[in-house]
Curated annotation (Swiss-Prot):
Main location: membrane
Signal peptide: 1-24
Protein name: Probable LRR receptor-like serine/threonine-protein kinase At2g28960
Catalytic residues (UniProt): D698
Annotated TM spans: 512-532
Keyword Ligase: no
Amino acid sequence: MEGRRQRLLVFIFGALAITHLVQAQPPDQRGFISLDCGLPVNESPYTDPRTGLTFSSDADFILSGLRGEAGDDNTYIYRQYKDLRYFPDGIRNCYNLKVEQGINYLIRAGFGYGNYDGLNVYPKFDLHVGPNMWIAVDLEFGKDREIIYMTTSNLLQICLVKTGSTIPMISTLELRPLRNDSYLTQFGPLDLIYRRAYSSNSTGFIRYPDDIFDRKWDRYNEFETDVNTTLNVRSSSPFQVPEAVSRMGITPENASLPLRFYVSLDDDSDKVNVYFHFAEIQALRGNETREFDIELEEDIIQSAYSPTMLQSDTKYNLSPHKCSSGLCYLKLVRTPRSTLPPLISAIEAFKVVDFPYAETNPNDVAAMKDIEAFYGLKMISWQGDPCVPELLKWEDLKCSYTNKSTPPRIISLDLSSRGLKGVIAPAFQNLTELRKLDLSNNSFTGGVPEFLASMKSLSIINLNWNDLTGPLPKLLLDREKNGLKLTIQGNPKLCNDASCKNNNNQTYIVPVVASVASVLIIIAVLILILVFKKRRPTQVDSLPTVQHGLPNRPSIFTQTKRFTYSEVEALTDNFERVLGEGGFGVVYHGILNGTQPIAVKLLSQSSVQGYKEFKAEVELLLRVHHVNLVSLVGYCDEESNLALLYEYAPNGDLKQHLSGERGGSPLKWSSRLKIVVETAQGLEYLHTGCKPPMVHRDVKTTNILLDEHFQAKLADFGLSRSFPVGGETHVSTAVAGTPGYLDPEYYRTNRLNEKSDVYSFGIVLLEIITSRPVIQQTREKPHIAAWVGYMLTKGDIENVVDPRLNRDYEPTSVWKALEIAMSCVNPSSEKRPTMSQVTNELKQCLTLENSKRGVREDMGSRSSVEMSTSFTTEINPKAR
């Protein structure tokens, strides 16, 4: 008997010890995502000593951004606010987080600016959850932001979106799964306004490990009467309010008055959800009663409510409430039969956020992610939702939109000229609504996959200029007969069914004709040698368009001279003298006909430009002729050797003179004006003198060449595009151009028109006035237009104009040029002038400068600047 009793006591004490041990363990962090943004990978993970939370580096969850450290003035107490990540590049930068679908998550973003960049300018930007805007962040009044959101897929994207000149940044990103039967999210996500645990005896936060969901409860002093207990308070509700919160509370200082609270809103139209947390923590005598009404303005959430003894309970409004005048008044009103005043432990107040946009169809998103991973694509715009919001959709694709609540579908994908290699990825077939697929001008190998024929929505497939091999699938050829537009030029090893059979038949007769072919080849070579000895570069007649399946590139329709690669080598003395280097390749000096200097631009094998841009530039320069557009002497299109031969500009480009790279005296103000007037005339001709009209798309100071008389020649037409006339106002196209000069409206919308060139020209005009870089190479990277706009508010022209001019200018002329420039860079394209208006205004500006200073233009400048502007209506414009 005694032995049994001893064994029982051992069992009881052991059970108590195990229970105590279990209770001492911190809550499970399963499902938590705790990112210290910018934390070096070699310091990850670590355990926060204050909370016991394990934080990891964010490096595996985002592809962009740079690491920073908060300055010494950063007062945050948590380790994770020491590091940060900032995003100087791109508009939208997104974290990709794997979550459980259909679960309520608490999402918390933390910001510790700490003057990390030394600029002491608080960033402003937007935060998005998936395709929807969550909050506009202003870190001058900043704090951590928190939202409760039910996930709609297994991938959650949190995006920082640049909205102005400052750079978005973030210190910490945390996700905590909640119970779905607690907070109401069916009316929309819940953006936290405040979460207060009422007590006047303590400060700081209550969070994990006291709160198993890691909610941050702010101990808040309402200057009322404190109530607290040391007894255990149970929590059986889905909210599981931490015991540290439920053990304290407040009652009104005047027991006969209500407890009053309020919620302040940013907008009168905002709606709120309020959660009141109670627990009776005072021992009531037999004749005592605590009973009160819970009121949200005029609505009674619950009448005659009595808290449960030593057990937490939560009451809330079942539908979002709209308050008057931007303030919501909350009251706990004692009932007539109550002997005790109201008591409350905590309040959580949320704004109900409208997330109107459905995410892009998840199968389309998964397909795009697979394609991105398959080819190792790293594109700054390919972040966040592919289609939504429309202004931020991914480059190179188009989507169909039914309404905001219907997931968009991807209907067009253009991956041409992306340097893609390998086979055509199977993931393309998962874009089941795709109508147009352009994979041209890449290096795809292998056969044309049969799954393309099973993509029922496809109506256009462009596979030109790849290294595809083998026969075309029969099903695909059948689809072509029924309306599918299939182009496969430039794939010499690709054949349709008939041509493949012919190739097989030819294997039997090769021995018969081999000797004959050899003789014919020898004769042909001898004839070619004789021909080339008699003439140098030859006139090329127009050739018929090459149909798909033929091995040769389509010929460029031309009446100018086509050079062989060996001739180009001879003209440049085997590429002896380098003039410069750009995105196309290296530019060499050459001599034509023994006396005429020329510039030869040779396409490099690693060039970001491809045959498409080369062809576009040749075709444009063959049909446009203007004294302020660079003249094409000839071109080389031989196998992989591509070259453009231009008239030589011995004075380099405008950028070199503005930056001082070429040495010598800086350009005078009158010379700068003359150059921009001539450049404006060239652009005006492209916009109004060409049929169809053209947009240059890459106007910048490095593309303005200067001949021996310093006459301006606009160059580099590889990105030029025609634009619509008549009723249409724009053409939709993938964004192309140079950062800093790129029209921001075109960047956002992909809608191109001639006003995009006007914006770029305005930036050029600001450059010749200030001689400042378009984007300063500082961490903040201020843009020249923003800087000039700020300086002009002071009204002092000397702070804006290039100091190297030594005030040697007519101030009225400079002011007028500044006004023209600022009108050109207006954010709205509709408010920008046309190039014709700009040209006329600048001519007046130049006349004003010359007349005020008594300067007479030389004949060379007059012949260009004073040229008449009569335009032709013919298909081919007249030379000017």
